[in-house]
Every structure is written in structure tokens, then in C-alpha cells.
Regions:
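Helix-capping and short linker residues that terminate individual alpha-solenoid repeat units
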Residues: 14-22, 63-66, 71, 196-197
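C-terminal functional modules
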Residues: 223-288
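A cross-kingdom marker of C-terminal helix-rich interaction/assembly modules
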Residues: 186-193, 267-271
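Extended, hydrophobic/aromatic-rich amphipathic alpha-helical segments that build helical scaffolds
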Residues: 6-20, 28-60, 159-190, 213-223
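C-terminal soluble interaction/assembly domains
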Residues: 197-200, 205-214, 228, 236, ...
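Long amphipathic alpha-helical coiled-coil segments
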Residues: 21-25, 242-244
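Hydrophobic-face positions in mid-chain alpha helices that act as interaction patches
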Residues: 6, 53-164, 213, 223, ...
């Protein structure tokens, strides 16, 4: 069944791409760039890294612009740095974002927001020092007994559309898996230069595929936070096994872990769907 779904997605994209302009009439209308980007994402999820690289390159040939987070932070750091001030800044990831292949927003969706969500302290620790994307979007705040990182940017944020940063990082991983580690790190560092402050920036290098993927995954988890992408990557890497990882965090003094093999990674079919005779007979996809 999974293979049939992949084939349906690929057929849909490959059939439509020939009739699409490079970019849509508006950012709400996908063009070839969005189709190529979705093909790259799909092939990556299928672990077909040759094809994922091919389509990431095709998407980047249409649009390779990245958001300048260093510039955005420098433009706004005066107000961001003010003690006790939590500004509301217009996001660079809105309708006019230059890194879009297409814009996807829906009210009341976890993949869309009119303001960036706050994040807990343990999640903030996952960003690199000097990360202007982090510094532009979050600032530590304590309210009563709770300390967290308050979101600072607002606007209709493109969390669900196809973006160039994802394509760069797909390309980097695919190159790493071909053991082209220098090329992979060059692609990653090209992206990092847009969000690591110059005084903190040091180019990354990797001596193994595992090290390269660890760096790339950190960048992808952070740059595409609140999108479906980090979850999709986790599912793929958990299934592959080689680069699986256990997630841990502390809540109320208690250590909580999520193992790669946990059933909690799988969304069960809704009971209503299983009980509905119109859906035919199918088996629940998790045991718990």
C-alpha cells in the first residue's frame, strides 16, 4: 500500500510538471519549482537519494535564493536586545519571502501560524551559537514559575509550503551519502552563512557520512522547525536504522524518552474510519 501511495504521488507530480510554468502566477500557485521540490522531498523519504539529488538541483536551478537572517537580525537587534521588550516583528517568511516555491497557509493548522510559536528551553538549546534565525525569532522570557522562549515574529508564516532551504539541505544529505563530504559541507555552509552571525561563523567539515548527516540534520531541524519536515526525516532515519536517535527531555524533574522503535511515531487510523463500513476492511497500523 505504501508503494502504491508513493507511485500515486510521483505520477501526479510528473504528469503535471510539464504543463507548469517555472514559478506560479502567484506564490499560492505552484510551478515547476514547487513540483521539483516536492519530488525531491518524496524521493528523499523513499531513500532514493540519486533521484532526490536530481530534483533538488532542478528546483534550485529555478530558485536558489535564501532568506538573509543575519541581515534581518542586524536590522532589528536594537529592539530585540531591549530588556523586558518582546517585539512583534514582521516575518521574512511571509507572502513576499524570496525563498518560496509556493506559499501554503491555513488557519487552525499546526503547520501554519500568524505568529511564530514559543519554544521550551530544552528546544532552544538545539540551535547553534550565533544563530540569527533563532535570535530573530525567540527571546527568553520568564512568567511566574515558567521560563520559555517567546516568539517574536508574526505574519502568515510559510511553514507548509516548499522552500529553497529544504532543497539545499536535501542536496547536502544526498551528496554526503555519495561520500562527497566536502561538497556536502560546502552546500551546508552556504546555507549557514545566511543565518550564523559572522563573528560566530566557522565552516563545518565532516570526516564521515554520519558526522555530515548529524550537522545537516541539526540545520534542517532548526531551519524547518514547526514544519512536517523534521518529523518526516525522523521517521525515515529511524526506519533506516543507521542514523536513528532517541529523543529525550526533562519534564517536572522526570526524564522522558522517545525511542526510534516506539509506536508513538506512527499515527493510528482513526477508530471512526476503521468502524465505517464504507471504508471496506483494513487493519490498524499500530498495535497500541
Amino acid at each position: 500500500m505504501i508503494q502504491e501511495i508513493y507511485e500515486f504521488i510521483l505520477n501526479d507530480l510528473n504528469t503535471s510538471v510539464a504543463d507548469l510554468p517555472d514559478m506560479g502566477t502567484t506564490l499560492l500557485h505552484p510551478g515547476k519549482g514547487a513540483a521539483y521540490a516536492m519530488l525531491a522531498r518524496t524521493y528523499l523519504q523513499m531513500m532514493n537519494y540519486e533521484k532526490a539529488l536530481e530534483f533538488a538541483d532542478k528546483a534550485l536551478a529555478i530558485n536558489d535564493k535564501l532568506v538573509d537572517w543575519v541581515g534581518f537580525y542586524n536590522d532589528n537587534k536594537g529592539v530585540i536586545a531591549q530588556e523586558g521588550v518582546y517585539p512583534s516583528l514582521k516575518t521574512p517568511l511571509g507572502f513576499d519571502s524570496q525563498d518560496c516555491y509556493n506559499f501554503n497557509y491555513a488557519d487552525n493548522s499546526s503547520n501554519s501560524a500568524s505568529a511564530i510559536f514559543k519554544i521550551p528551553v530544552n528546544r532552544a538549546a538545539g540551535f547553534e551559537e550565533g544563530d540569527a534565525y533563532f535570535l530573530s525569532n525567540w527571546k527568553q522570557r520568564t512568567m511566574g514559575a515558567e521560563t520559555y522562549y517567546q516568539g517574536l515574529t508574526n505574519g502568515y508564516i510559510n511553514l507548509a509550503g516548499m522552500r529553497t532551504v529544504e532543497q539545499y539541505l536535501i542536496k547536502a544529505e544526498c551528496l554526503a551519502r555519495k561520500n562527497q563530504l566536502t561538497d556536502a559541507m560546502d552546500v551546508l555552509n552556504e546555507v549557514r552563512k545566511t543565518y550564523i552571525l559572522p563573528e560566530k561563523y566557522q565552516p563545518l567539515s565532516a570526516s564521515s557520512v554520519a558526522e555530515a548527516i548529524r550537522y545537516i540534520r541539526q540545520a534542517k531541524d532548526n531551519q524547518l522547525i514547526f514544519s512536517i519536515v523534521p518529523f518526516g526525516d525522523a521517521r525515515r532515519l529511524n526506519a533506516e536504522g543507521t542514523y536513528a536517535r532517541t529523543l529525550t527531555k526533562e519534564i517536572d524533574g522526570k526524564q522522558i524518552s522517545l525511542a526510534p522503535s516506539s509506536h508513538l511515531w506512527t499515527f493510528p487510523f482513526p477508530k471512526g474510519a476503521i468502524d465505517n463500513p464504507g471504508n471496506g476492511s483494513f487493519v490498524q497500523n499500530v498495535e497500541k
